[in-house]
Every structure is written in structure tokens, then in C-alpha cells.
């Protein structure tokens, strides 16, 4: 007797077999091979090898009025409950069975195990003919000529893998045929199916080369197979010859896979089918491999399936991975689902009956639809688990697991009902019927028809409380057309359909693009390009960050920025953009374009200026305000702050690169500042004034486009007040000596520039704003202050240029008051055409306090720049400009 702790047991989700012979008689075709490979074997935990022979049982089930048979292997001693003596818990398979069967889905859960002895005994029965008999029903939609290519590919794969075994002991050829079957169930074209058959031939054998595949089946098949296998083979060679870690090699493989799928989407579709079958047979791998593969599937492949809209594959990958990664949590969730369903089974049945009756009695639907199906659907186990984690409560306390009813309508052709009745209008009509019966819960109606998800998903969602039998439970109702339902399940795969036209899936019959062999490929379809637009981001990142990002960083960027939870926002033109949850307006700016992010000075959300730290929420309208004339140093300082607010790795990498570029442009100035700071911090006794940096400040044309250059006069440059008592005059900035000071004539056009943390001291009798700000000139000219040395010098005015937004004057004055700056008066003018505002404050302050306050004014939301100034006495003819 084999001990419980050494048994290899798994839970199997067996798809109900409804495969036909292909002879038109709709006879069921079920064999040990066809059902066994299709069945996902999901481990409940603690696998170990066993020599105990399985006992085969035959079950009968009905679907759509037809009976079919399926064959599986079950352990007699453990019919319902599987326990492990060394394990801290028991897996309750009874609840798993109950939850799956009660949901009315298309799957049944059974105990399943395959031993090496039984599979090796069956290997002699595997021939090309038996494999073709099992594969043909799933690809019978292909034309005869294309079926010949598939059969040719099967023979080639059979020869290449002859004599090879899987870990389970079964012939290796079963795996590629199973992958081809999965692709056939998605009704993909023959190139994809042949690539599925050959995807391991180059990697695992020396019999097949890429050149041979191209010669036999064309460049498209070679490209797909190459994307599947070539990189993995190189990765294996690296492991043997180099000192790289397994994680680095795996990251490099994933990076190459991501890049390959940007050129050919079918690379990832075949890869998903390959991973799905590997997950279904993962029970034969060692426990540490199971955990690693399942974790990678949850992190990379399931989110990729979601991005492609392939929800059927995504759901199965998540649930299978969940059972391997956390068997205890899986058991608790399934038990909770079963208990909740038992509590509300009566109400759900009654709600279904009421809704069906309402639809049957509606005359409009009878006129415009062929038929309407109402299905009872269970939420996926893993999605419920994530919702429970989000609520930060125990799964046993989580009661908001909404049961689902899915309404799928099949409209009549538009010729029969007229152009005024579109499929979308029928869906909205059904939504109205649902709300006539039950009132919707506020903020639960989601219209994915008007605003589809980026992967093409379309449906109407609403959540109601039926109030039946004095019981309250949430009932989610989904409404979609037959075409929408097909796209929701298969996603991007419908655009590689094996038929000549994609009929009705995107509105009308759309002739698809053609590949090298003249087969339909949909590469020129606008909807297709829209649904895989996120692939462009991967390609752009590779081009932008080549040499600056390791493979592990690149893969981490993709998994976090693309494959995580998303939020959907709108551009001002109504385009939908999706970003990772928690992204800020800084991330949005760099998502639109790198140059937009580099030139960003402010952002508006729903028409209101917001802080760069603003976290985006669903359905917000985001607008980025850019400015082309920011100085290098000002841009450097702003983006250095924004680096802290960027949440996506891609935005952070772009900002880092921008900072390096800006640092190179103003390297001399930055180096000089760093030297001066170091000397000041070291309490040096050197009191000599340092020479100013060589930076050439840009003319701020957009703000002062009409300011006239001043007439140059023959003035001496050495008009700085002489130091008193023979002392060396060296003003302090922020308490530090030896800051760079520039003494320049007033004829230099450098009197108003964006704030960069350096005070600019200007004479008041220069009409700087005469052309653009006439109201300020006379006000300022009447204010004359006196320049004093070191501790006694005074500042006369402060000019702040900002975006025109409500409350900005109050915020700036609050900052000034908080720093103890005395305000004598203030005027402001607005340029509504450009959305700019200029504020001019008459103040009393010294250099130390002014430099400190200007640095804080620069951080006020919407401030683009500032400039400060003073004046010499009127008796002084040689007006000078001092910058410190």
C-alpha cells in the first residue's frame, strides 16, 4: 500500500468532449488521447512519485441535448477527499467539484493522475494516423489544401520527435499535437497550427532547421517557430557555458520573446497555447519547478493573454497557476464560492427564470434577433482571490462575490431589420429590460461598448440586487452580441481566423491582409492595429533603452508597466490611453511621447491644473501643457523633482536619460556650483569672488516676444559699489559665501528668465515690460530703492510668471508671507491667448531671504519662472544688472 504522503494526485478540469467525427453526423469522438491531453491537470499540492496503478473510469455527461463520453483515470481510494499525512491541511475536492458543477459551466472537475507505466504502455498505439484522427476535428474548418499542409507538418513533427518522451513517460509528440488542438479550437489559420506542431522541433532535435521549415511551409511559419524556439535554445547554451544566473538567462529569453512578438503577434499566441498545455501537465514536474513555472505564468503569460483579449486562455492559466502557487488559498476560495452559491442557488435560479421570461415576452427582441441566450456564469477563482486581497479581509468574510448572468444576443442581418437597429442598440435595449426588473446599484453600470477596452473587449455590465426570497445578493449581468462574445473569449485570435473573411467581427466583412503565401493575416486592419498598439511601446523601449537597460530590467519594465493592473484615461481628443494603476500625470506625458514629457511644465485633469503627483483615475481627461523655451538648468531641476513622482519604469528611464542630456549641456555651470558649494560648506576663508559660469541664458521669447532690446550706451562695467572699510564684498546666498555673481550692463537681453534657483537683481528704471505689460511700467518706475552692501542691500520687486489658474496669486503671496517678505503692493496681468499670468510684487527683502523664498516660489504649481530686481539711486547713471 502506498502511503498518502507519496501519492501523486491532481485535480483535473476535463472539458466536456463534443468532438465530431467530421462526417456530418455529429457523432461524438472521444478517445484516451483526445480527452487526456486536453484536460488540465491542476495539482492540489505536495506532489510525489508513486507506483500505484490508476484505475480507469468512464463518465457520461450531457451538453446541448447530446451525450458524450470522456475517459479519465481516478484513484479508487480517494474518490472525493485527498489528504496528505505530512501536510498541514486537507484539500476538499468535494467543494471544488460542487462549485464547478453548480455554476453550469462547460467543465467538470475530476481526480486525475497519469502514471509512467500506463502512458508508456499506450505509446505503441500512437501513430501519425491516430494523431491525425484526434487532431482533425478541431481543424476541420480549414480548406482541403490547407489541411494538407497541416498533415505534412504533423508527419514532420512525428519524425523529429520519434523516440522522445516527456517527464510523464508519454510520447513527446503528444505535446505539439495538443498545442495544435488548442490553436484549432481558436480557429486559427494553418500557419499558426503548423507552427504549433513544429515549435519544439528545432530546439529539441537536430533533424529540423529553420531553413527546412521555410522551404516546406514558407517564411511566416519559420518566423513564428523561430520566435518560439531559437532564443530558448540560446538560453540553454548560456546556462552551460557562462556564469550567468538562471534569472538573467530567463530574462534574456523573455526579452527576445517580447521583441519577436512585436513583429509577429502569432508568436505569442502559439506561445500561450504551448504554456497552457504545459500548465495542464505540470503535475509531472518537480515541486520547485511547478512553483517557478506557475509564478512566471501568473506574472507574464496570463497578463499577456488578457492584453490580447484571449480571456478563455487567460482564465485557465490563472486558475491552474493559482492552484500550484497557493493550494491552501485556492481551496479556501473554492470552498467559499461553493458555500455562497449554495446560499443563493434558489434566488439565482429564480432570477434567471424572470429574466428569460422578460426577454421572451419582448416584441422588439423577437423582431430584431435570431435568438437570445441567458447563461449562468461563475467568476473565476483567481479574480475573486485578488478581490479579497484588495479588500484586506479574510476570504471567509468576503461576501460580495457577485453571481453572473450573461446575455448573448444574435441579431438578425441588418438587411432584415433596417439600418436603424444596430447590434449595439439591441444591447442597450436589453440593458433597459434588466433595469426595468431590478434597479442597478449606483456606479456599477459599465459601458464597454461605447468605450471598448484596448484589447477590443466590448460588453455592457450592470450589477443589481434582485431582492428575492428576503435575500440580498449582488447579481452581475453582462450583455453582449454573439460577435462580441467571440472576441471576448478569443481576442486577437479572431483576426487570424482560418477563414477567408473576418465576417461581422468588426462591423462588416473585412478582407484581411495577406502574407507571403497569400493567406489571410489581417495585418492591415485598423482595429487590429489598435488592439495591439501596446506592442509598439515594447518596440520603442527596446530602441530607446538599448544599452542602458539590462534584460532583467527590460522584462521588469514590461511586466510592471504593461502587464499589471490598469487605469484608462482620455486624451483631449477622446482617445483612450491605459496606464498602470497608480500612474501619475508625469507617466502619462511620457506615454504620449518622450518629447512631450521632456517639455512638460504643467498638467490639467478634467480642465483643472493638478500637481505632478496627481494619481490618475479611470475616465479622467488629461492634458499636458508644454513649453519649448525652458533653460537647461530649469528643466534639469524640474525633472529631477518629477523623477520622484514617476511610477512607471519606462518614464523613470526616460527622465534619467533626459537629466543626463541636460547635465551635459550645462556641465560647466553645474560643476561650478558644486565647487562653490563644497568650498562654502568646508568653511573656507577664501573671500574672493568667483567668476560666473559660462552658461548662455536663453531668451524667453514666448513670454516677452514684444519686449524691445534696450539701446546700448557707453557705460563703464566697473560700477559696483566699492567695499567699505577696505573689506572684500562677498554676499551670502542661503548662508554660503562664494556664490557666482555676474555684473553685466543693462543692454544685455537677460533681464527676465525662468526661475532656476538664482536671484537676478535688475534696475527698476529698465522698462522690461513696456510692450507686453504696459500697466506695470509706470507703477514700477515710480519706485526707487537703494542698493546697500552685504547685509543692508534691499530688493525692490519680484516678478513671477505662471500659468493662469484660480488661486495662484494667493499661493504665491502665502509663500512670500511665510518667509517673512514684506509686501508693499502688487499688480498682475493676464495673457488669455496663451493662458499665462505675470505678477509683479513690490517687496522689501535682502538677498539671503529672497533666494530662499524664490526657490520655494518655483515649486508652486503652475509657476513657470521668476525674476527679482532692485535699482541704483537715480543719481547713478550707469545702471547695472547683478546676478547671484
From Swiss-Prot:
E.C. number: 2.7.6.5
SUPFAM superfamilies: ACT-like, HD-domain/PDEase-like, Nucleotidyltransferase, TGS-like
Biased composition (Polar residues): 711-727
Gene3D superfamilies: 3.10.20.30, Beta Polymerase, domain 2, Hypothetical protein af1432
Enzyme class (EC, first level): transferase
Domain annotation TGS: ranges: 563-626
Catalysed reaction, written as an equation: GTP + ATP = guanosine 3'-diphosphate 5'-triphosphate + AMP
Positions of the HD domain: 172-279
Tissue: Expressed in hypocotyls, shoots, cotyledons, rosette leaves, sepals and pistils.
One annotated GO biological process: photosynthesis
Keywords noted in UniProt: ATP-binding, Chloroplast, GTP-binding, Kinase, Nucleotide-binding, Plastid, Stress response, Transferase, Transit peptide
Entry superkingdom: Eukaryota
Annotated GO CC locations: chloroplast
First and last residue of the signal peptide: none
MF terms (GO), sorted A to Z: ATP binding; GTP binding; GTP diphosphokinase activity; guanosine-3',5'-bis(diphosphate) 3'-diphosphatase activity; kinase activity
Subcellular location: Plastid, Chloroplast
InterPro entries per record: ACT-like_dom_sf (IPR045865), Beta-grasp_dom_sf (IPR012675), HD/PDEase_dom (IPR003607), HD_domain (IPR006674), NT_sf (IPR043519), RelA_SpoT (IPR007685), TGS (IPR004095), TGS-like (IPR012676)
Conditions for induction: Circadian-regulation with a peak at dusk. Down-regulated by wounding and 12-oxo-phytodienoic acid (OPDA).
UniProt xrefs under SMART domains: HDc (SM00471), RelA_SpoT (SM00954)
Transit peptide, residues from-to: 1-55
Database matches in PANTHER family: GTP DIPHOSPHOKINASE RSH1, CHLOROPLASTIC-RELATED (PTHR43061:SF1)
Other remarks in the entry: In the ecotype Landsberg erecta, RSH1 (AC P0DKG8) has been shown to interact with RPP5 (AC O04264).
Subunit structure: Interacts with RPP4. Interacts with RPP5.
Family label: Belongs to the RelA/SpoT family.
Function: May be involved in a rapid plant ppGpp (guanosine 3'-diphosphate 5'-diphosphate)-mediated response to pathogens and other stresses. Unable to functionally complement E.coli relA mutants.
Protein name per the record: Putative GTP diphosphokinase RSH1, chloroplastic
Organism: Arabidopsis thaliana (Mouse-ear cress)
